[in-house]
Amino acid sequence: MSTKEIVKNVNIKNKKASFEYEFLEKYEAGIVLKGTEIKAIRMSKASISEAYCLFDNEELWIKNMNISSYDKGSFYNHDPLSARKLLLRKAELKKLFMHSKEKGLTIIALRLFTNERGYAKIEIALAKGKKLYDKRESIKSKDNEREMQRIRI
């Protein structure tokens, strides 16, 4: 890609994540992709709503991230649900590895985006699942905020 070419900013969010989880720490990670995968991401043909991360041989992998097939890829296309390696610093990987072993904590994908250089990045978070009453509480607070906005206008 030339430097003069304008890159469309991609911003794919996991909307269910903030409702179902409480985020403890957030990280920005690079993704190891094949050629047709990055082209499909730039066309916003990806979904991270079912994605989760796990460790394999001290490497962080994301599973269940759906990157649809690229239309013009012919037989060079990729597998839409294959596992993809995430790139983080060693200190961050060690910290995540230690915390992910704790009971009740998981690593989930929050947002898939492209940076100003055109590289695909993913925002992940160390998260703890919310209880049912926590979910009800967050719904009530959102309703109250909407009511306050209506009153102000």
Curated annotation (Swiss-Prot):
Protein's name in the database: SsrA-binding protein
MF GO annotations: RNA binding
Gene3D superfamilies in the cross-refs: 2.40.280.10
Entry's localization field: Cytoplasm
Species this chain originates from: Cytophaga hutchinsonii (strain ATCC 33406 / DSM 1761 / CIP 103989 / NBRC 15051 / NCIMB 9469 / D465)
Gene assigned in the entry: smpB
Presence of keyword Cytoplasm: yes
Gene Ontology CC: cytosol
Primary localization class, coarse: cytoplasm
Record bears the keyword RNA-binding: yes
Family annotation (SUPFAM superfamilies): Small protein B (SmpB)
InterPro entries: SmpB, SsrA-bd_prot, SsrA-bd_prot_CS
Entry superkingdom: Bacteria
Summary of the function given for this chain in its UniProt record: Required for rescue of stalled ribosomes mediated by trans-translation. Binds to transfer-messenger RNA (tmRNA), required for stable association of tmRNA with ribosomes. tmRNA and SmpB together mimic tRNA shape, replacing the anticodon stem-loop with SmpB. tmRNA is encoded by the ssrA gene; the 2 termini fold to resemble tRNA(Ala) and it encodes a 'tag peptide', a short internal open reading frame. During trans-translation Ala-aminoacylated tmRNA acts like a tRNA, entering the A-site of stalled ribosomes, displacing the stalled mRNA.
Entry similarity comment: Belongs to the SmpB family.
Signal peptide: none
HAMAP family in the cross-refs: SmpB (MF_00023)
Keywords annotated in UniProt: Cytoplasm, RNA-binding
GO biological process: trans-translation
CDD domains xrefs: SmpB
